[in-house]
């Protein structure tokens, strides 16, 4: 029996990506941009930088040749690593004017012996780019702004409006006929506020006015399914589906299924996984293994439009 061999993904990468997801990852300045991501550093990194920003010390690794190429315009043909260290540090600080209060303390030749993903900082301008790997991500997270809405997928959420609850027995429901009248709960009426649910969570009250809804206050209620009221929309639970295949079966095949039956998904072993949420296709990925468990690495996202 052959076993499915999947690409490996480390639990440390999952944890670091989850932490990074809370913070802004793209920054622009007049001459270029800075991107934060997570990747495993190459084993051949040979340059170490000691920096200080906003009172916090950072250690970064990069390729020495990439650093020299990034500084080419200021070197006037001189080899960067033959310059006095004081001049090297001054040139570096000149290139980081988009980060006020950044101080370059030291630069040296050194290798990085790390075999796990790290936070990566990629600087880009025109046709030049350089990547740095940071050994202390948590220290930087403490200084970063929260992730803006512009860096989020504009996934619409469903808000349902629910009137007061009416409890009926099973026999009463079964006996309902066209024209039957149910008594509304005491104290309710046409002008009573309605409770808005976000997903399956009570969220806020609205007042119906003609064809408009006026938001009149947050809900602090709970229900049987959700004992805690929803106070932070970032914690809204959303059911997500990961499809490795979708197939149409004829009625005979479907009703004849039994233990041992085989269904051809017509999907390659290393085929794509579809990511769906709220009935919308969000993107595609590939199956990976994370410490003996299945995971999905997202490869591309689809454009989500709100209609």
From Swiss-Prot:
Superkingdom of origin: Bacteria
Mind telling me which SUPFAM superfamilies this protein's record contains? Answer: Surface presentation of antigens (SPOA) (SSF101801)
Is Lipid biosynthesis there in the keyword field? Answer: no
UniProt-listed Pfam families? FliMN_C
Q: Tell me if Cell membrane is a UniProt keyword of this record.
A: no
Keyword terms: Plasmid, Protein transport, Transport, Virulence
Chain's role: Component of the Yop secretion machinery.
User: What's the family?
Assistant: Belongs to the FliN/MopA/SpaO family.
Alphabetical list of PANTHER family matching this protein: FLAGELLAR MOTOR SWITCH PROTEIN FLIM, YOP PROTEINS TRANSLOCATION PROTEIN Q
Q: What is this protein called?
A: Yop proteins translocation protein Q
User: What is the source species?
Assistant: Yersinia pseudotuberculosis serotype I (strain IP32953)
Gene of this entry:
yscQ
């Amino acid at each position: 029996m052959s076993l499915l061999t999947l690409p490996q993904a480390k639990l440390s990468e999952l944890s670091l990506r989850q932490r990074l997801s809370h913070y802004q990852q793209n920054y622009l300045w007049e001459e270029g941009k800075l991107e934060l991501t997570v990747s495993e550093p190459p084993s051949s990194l040979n340059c170490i930088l000691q920096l200080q920003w906003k009172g916090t010390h950072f250690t970064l690794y990069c390729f020495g040749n990439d650093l020299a190429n990034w500084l080419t315009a200021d070197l006037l043909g001189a080899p960067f690593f033959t310059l006095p260290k004081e001049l090297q540090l001054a040139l570096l600080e000149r290139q980081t004017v988009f980060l006020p209060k950044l101080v370059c303390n030291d630069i040296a030749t050194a290798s990085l012996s790390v075999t796990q993903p790290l936070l990566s900082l990629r600087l880009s301008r025109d046709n030049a780019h350089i990547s740095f790997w940071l050994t202390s991500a948590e220290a930087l997270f403490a200084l970063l702004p929260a992730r803006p809405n512009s860096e989020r997928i504009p996934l619409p959420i469903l808000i349902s409006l629910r009137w007061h609850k009416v409890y009926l027995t099973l026999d009463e429901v079964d006996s309902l006929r066209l024209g039957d009248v149910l008594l509304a709960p005491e104290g309710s009426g046409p002008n009573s506020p309605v409770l808005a649910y976000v997903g399956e969570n009570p969220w806020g009250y609205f007042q119906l006015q003609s064809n408009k809804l006026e938001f009149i206050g947050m809900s602090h209620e709970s229900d049987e399914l959700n004992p805690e009221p929803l106070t932070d929309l970032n914690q809204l639970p959303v059911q997500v589906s990961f499809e490795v295949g979708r197939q149409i079966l004829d009625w005979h095949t479907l009703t004849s299924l039994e233990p041992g039956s085989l269904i051809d998904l017509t999907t390659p072993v290393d085929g794509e996984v579809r990511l769906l949420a709220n009935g919308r296709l969000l993107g595609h990925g590939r199956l990976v293994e994370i410490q003996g468990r299945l995971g999905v690495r997202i490869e591309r996202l689809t454009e989500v439009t709100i209609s």
